[in-house]
Amino acid sequence: MKKYYVLITLIVLISLVAACAPTAPTSAPTDAPAAAAPTEVQLTENEQWAKDNGVGPYQPASEDWAAIEAAAKEEGSVCVYSNSSKIEKLIEPWSALYPDIKLDCGDTDGITTKMQAEQEAGNVVGDVWFNSDGHILYGMFMPNQWLWWYTPEGVVVSGVTAERPYAMQRHSIDVWGYNQEINPDGCPLTNWWQLTEAELNGKVFLENPLVDPSTTAKITLIVENADDMAKAYMDLYGKEWTTDEMAGPDAYGVVAENAGFLFLRKLARNHPVLEPGGDEVDEAYASLGMDSAIEPGYGLTGWDSYETTLDGELAMAPCLTMEPVVGIKKNSYVAIANKAPHPNAAKLFIKFALSEEGAKPWTAIGIYPGVDSLPLAEGMPAIGTYKLWESNDAFAWANNSAVRDFFATELLGGE
């Protein structure tokens, strides 16, 4: 028992000693580890070029135009690939402004193919894209960083957004043209569907959409705006387009998915004449002195062809009372080629092309300038006067191939 009390006493004493012992010092709090510096985004080779030259997303808010012009003079020339022969009319005013910088290249066939090949080969010749084919611009060239957008400071171009940054130099309107010499009282047509009727078999003219991507995009718009075409069918015939005898499956089991496809089927089976270019289209139905006893037909053409009529060289006039729309509004873009050999001269050219002087060759009936502040041609109605289909580059890029193949099949005898 005595040993038991001794043990208890020892335990109590040990506990007291432990309680009185000094507390171990608390460690000072350590600072939180410094946040790692953000990793700098690595630019692609093309992005680095764009940054070095101040184009695309790297364009500064303000630029020294005296320095740009001096650098452009050192470059000595600018190669502009244009799909319009009217660019030749810019040579004289350009040379007056910039005698030390040659305006080169000009009207060019196959611009998209040429510039794609140059970019893929790394042998860039063209400095500036001055072309339509927006579906290829946005669908292929922009994702591959082959073309950079550039709008000079202070220039307001309608339709330019963060998603659609390329400047539009002009908006051209395509319409159905008729021969006003044979039809002096006006266009006999009021509805697109009349173009598919037997009376006009072999009498509708257009550029070949099987080889011309711009025309392919135009007929793709018909499919995109199928609801408009359905209403126009009802307005003309008083019944739904689905009741048409050609709406069902063809010999291959292919049906017309909507009223736009039905229109293309009926047009194709009405034997349209596919021409190599716009001049040939106009000559086919609107040449002067055609036999009035023979139906001249109609052509899908630029409204600006009417300028040639005013010059006394053609009998084309636009059908301005057509349903569902009068025409198609298409865009011509300006952009700087990636790794352009003359980037400063390219900037000067775009600034010039977006000016009143640079727009003069295209200040014509049927064309609206891309810069809102520029004047219209005398007699040109304000934009919005007529209903037009707007070009849809994204839809065209996604659907052109399918629409072209459908049209080709119908031309070859889909029945």
Where are these regions (language model features)?
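Short, low-complexity disordered leader/linker segments with a strong preference
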Residues: 1-75, 415
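An extracytoplasmic/periplasmic, membrane-proximal ligand-sensing/linker region
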Residues: 54-58, 71, 372-415
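Extracytoplasmic ligand-binding site segments that recognize negatively charged/polar headgroups
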Residues: 79-92, 104-116, 124-280
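Alpha-to-beta junction loops
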Residues: 99-100, 119-130, 200-203, 287-298
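A ligand-binding cleft/hinge motif common to bilobed small-molecule-binding domains
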Residues: 135-140, 293-315
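Periplasmic-binding protein-like
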Residues: 156-160, 170-174, 263-267, 311-338
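Mature extracytoplasmic/periplasmic domains
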Residues: 327-393
